[in-house]
Amino acid sequence: MRQKETTATTRFSLLPGSITRFFLLLIIVLLVTMGVMVQSAVNAWLKDKSYQIVDITHAIQKRVDNWRYVTWQIYDNIAATTSPSSGEGLQETRLKQDVYYLEKPRRKTEALIFGSHDNSTLEMTQRMSTYLDTLWGAENVPWSMYYLNGQDNSLVLISTLPLKDLTSGFKESTVSDIVDSRRAEMLQQANALDERESFSNMRRLAWQNGHYFTLRTTFNQPGHLATVVAFDLPINDLIPPGMPLDSFRLEPDATATGNNDNEKEGTDSVSIHFNSTKIEISSALNSTDMRLVWQVPYGTLLLDTLQNILLPLLLNIGLLALALFGYTTFRHFSSRSTENVPSTAVNNELRILRAINEEIVSLLPLGLLVHDQESNRTVISNKIADHLLPHLNLQNITTMAEQHQGIIQATINNELYEIRMFRSQVAPRTQIFIIRDQDREVLVNKKLKQAQRLYEKNQQGRMIFMKNIGDALKEPAQSLAESAAKLNAPESKQLANQADVLVRLVDEIQLANMLADDSWKSETVLFSVQDLIDEVVPSVLPAIKRKGLQLLINNHLKAHDMRRGDRDALRRILLLLMQYAVTSTQLGKITLEVDQDESSEDRLTFRILDTGEGVSIHEMDNLHFPFINQTQNDRYGKADPLAFWLSDQLARKLGGHLNIKTRDGLGTRYSVHIKMLAADPEVEEEEERLLDDVCVMVDVTSAEIRNIVTRQLENWGATCITPDERLISQDYDIFLTDNPSNLTASGLLLSDDESGVREIGPGQLCVNFNMSNAMQEAVLQLIEVQLAQEEVTESPLGGDENAQLHASGYYALFVDTVPDDVKRLYTEAATSDFAALAQTAHRLKGVFAMLNLVPGKQLCETLEHLIREKDVPGIEKYISDIDSYVKSLL
């Protein structure tokens, strides 16, 4: 029992060390309490202000809903009411030019009319003013209403302010600015077709110190301008006294979705943002796209928080000061007292430390001996030193070591040892000896050198073996491929493809050997990157067509960009990576992007992006070690296991590297960074470009394809337009589209799987837009065809047909009616009125048929077909053709 009591007293003793720890714990608790107190006070203040903002938002929303109803009442019932007898006895006073004051018996509200108007507007103003007298009779804050009449474009202002007095000196007063700004806002909203209701930002009435915002509502009237009703809704009576009015802001809500199904959730949502100098508390107004924002400085938050927690905070600070004083006092006292009081824990620690030192000494792979010369005894030694100690004369070893910088060699039992001596810095007459077996180290070094020589020999032998086996396989593989290509059997094509794969693998093995033994040499030539791409595309196009993939070539370099470097190496890199991307992609597309680095014009980046399943981690290891892991495969074969390593090594030979980034299920991006010197521009482009003064209509659905084609054509000097950019009467020379149904006349059909240029109809060609040379050939062929057609059609068109028109006796009627119908075609096409457009085209077709003008009749029939299909680009083209035909007849 006594033993338990003594242990309890020692555990909870009041020694200075224990009291110091208690004070330290108290300081930590007080600091945490202070932080929690401040945080709770700040959160409570923010929560209270958030509730106030929500209440203000509810009040503003209720006011908006009420005055929405009043707006509709004024427009539907009061402004639209016609009472013939009510206009008798009305009187207005002209204050300024186009400014009239309505005289009325009740003076709660006053009304001004701006602009010329009739009696109906005066009567309507009287009714609205009387109605607002009733609504605003008990209000003390200023209210105003603006009514922009769509009938006569007059503006009516009804307000509780003394308008007649304020209007004196109208052009110099603030009322003039307010009325002008309101009229501009209402006219702007009246012209906006997609905006029925809008709100203004928070505004301030200077002489009344009133804050308000404007609710504007538009009412469309057939045959007249839109009518706009605007109310200035004050908020002075909605804001609590402790919140300054100038700190409120009403702004559009960027997060509004437009369908507030849950009204309570929508109105009670509050967001708090901490900016650099202020705190913003905002709440959205339900059924509107606005939100109310209250800005408060950080100083206000700190002052309000300190006022709420001042007494507890002072008490906490006082306790913290006492705890710090006690901690410092008892800490110095405990440090003085423990200097003279021995502790048993020190002895235990020394014992443990000595045991650890003995364990370390016994595990050393060297001999360790610590010798004290004064007492001639060994202080520390391990087994290796104890084994050699009987054969050592430490006195002689010490003397010789002092003469040879502390290092000597000694032979013990025909074994060579190196002995190093160090003098102890703690005990002056104590030496430390380290004994190392030299024979064992020499033997180990010999074995290491022999292993290194054997490794280098094996490496050299492997390289020679791979080179010889590659040379031995190359000739039979080529012979096999040539023989398979000459066969006419049904299986010969498959056999030839497999033979080509074998030849390609042998070539890659030889290239890998040359790169490994550094015997590969670069051949620098001057070449065009675009021409190189035009060679690569046909090589990978069959595999892409076979799998149903889409290929996009996006070359951002200049049209005639010339580079100096190894063309064959770059071609092999692109082929290897694109073939690998085709194999690993089952659906989607493969994109090749070519860019010039912004840092240097001599550095190029080739990016190949696919939409496959991605490359696994094991396949990525093939980037650093050739053919170390298996690769993906499809039903046509396996991906090339040497592609990554060869591409990276060739890119490094070209001064760059290969980078691969992949994501499972999304695809892979292969980035090849190389250095290709740009050719010095000898002569600027002074000559005329290929397609200068040629206008091309590009009707392409895909934005990527449209950008690729537009860049190519503009590099050749053409002007490209789209159906949306084209004017009604604007002509173009060449028509390009990727939709076969849009190719109703001569033009180019763009495709990504065409091997070159193919004729699909008279004056219609199908071309692969990824191949620049094919695109250029197709454009030139189409221009030649169109020039040939123009030579045929330039035969006297107006000869027989003009004579026939004059002989029919209807020439005067033709001149009076047909040009007007052609203008009507342009107008109806601009408004997309297809029904009226069809009637006009049918009427013109009848005129041409009656006069036996067959070309005009055929043009109208084609136009009717395009109208039924709603083909806007085709409609515009044929309207232009009909216009040209009519002008040629006239």
Curated annotation (Swiss-Prot):
- Recorded topology in the membrane: Multi-pass membrane protein
* Listed InterPro entries: HATPase_C_sf (IPR036890), His_kinase_dom (IPR005467), HPT_dom_sf (IPR036641), Ptransferase_RcsD (IPR030861), RcsD_ABL (IPR032306), RcsD_ABL_sf (IPR038616), Sig_transdc_His_kin_Hpt_dom (IPR008207)
Which residue spans belong to the Cytoplasmic compartment? Answer: 1-21, 330-890
Region described as Histidine-like kinase: spans on this chain: 468-678
Record-listed E.C. numbers: 2.7.2.-
Q: Which residues carry this modification: Phosphohistidine?
A: 842
Q: Which UniProt keywords apply?
A: ATP-binding, Cell inner membrane, Cell membrane, Kinase, Membrane, Nucleotide-binding, Phosphoprotein, Transferase, Transmembrane, Transmembrane helix, Two-component regulatory system
Q: Where in the cell is it found?
A: Cell inner membrane
CDD domains linked: HPT
Q: Can you supply one Gene Ontology CC term for this chain's record?
A: plasma membrane
Q: Is Cell wall biogenesis/degradation one of the keywords UniProt gives this record?
A: no
Regions that span the bilayer:
22-42, 309-329
By its UniProt entry, which PROSITE patterns does this protein fall under?
Answer: HIS_KIN, HPT
Q: How is it modified after translation?
A: Phosphorylated by RcsC.
Q: Which SUPFAM superfamilies does the protein's record reference? A: ATPase domain of HSP90 chaperone/DNA topoisomerase II/histidine kinase (SSF55874), Histidine-containing phosphotransfer domain, HPT domain (SSF47226)
Topological region Periplasmic: 43-308
Any Gene Ontology biological process: phosphorelay signal transduction system
Q: What HAMAP family does the record tag this protein with? A: RcsD
What binding partners and quaternary form does the record give? Interacts with RcsC and RcsB. Has a higher affinity for RcsB than for RcsC.
* Recorded family membership: Belongs to the RcsD family.
Question: What name appears for this protein in its UniProt entry?
Answer: Phosphotransferase RcsD
Give the organism the record lists: Escherichia coli (strain K12)
List the gene name: rcsD
